[in-house]
Amino acid sequence: GSMRLTSPLSPAIHTGATRILVISTRDGVPDRLPATAPEPPSIGEMAAYALDIMFNDNLEADTERMLRINNTVSLLSPEAREKTPLKVIETLMLNPSQDIRPIAKRHRGSLPRAMRILMRSLGVMGGDGRMESYLMFEPDYVSDLIALGYADTLARRDEVAGFLAG
């Protein structure tokens, strides 16, 4: 939902969700600034950043907005809560325990030749793996992502089970 929507959680909220499980592809660790002034980004790198913003920034901003509303609603008296259409929506966000871009970089050689040529011509192939992480659906890469998600979810198994049990 976060590709078309600036508020990707909105459809779930407006259809009456009382709990939302949010699964993100961003590890939550901010990117480090380079020690030296970077080269100007290529067209492909700018496109990769645009994809990152479209998918992740909107999701994170919407989740943060919902948590602020939850906090505000929880401060209201029971009488005041009855007068507002706002309600507390339980939320659990699952983030990968590691940045998925290095995983994409490891698998970039498995991209079809035409895709590698296109990405090289756009100046992306030597980059940080951001574009590849969005475009790659090669079986080994997807398997690594599934394994990471599975391990991360097992590490939070009690929290996830409690959330799903309601």
Give residue ranges: language-model regions.
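Patatin-like phospholipase
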Residues: G1-G166
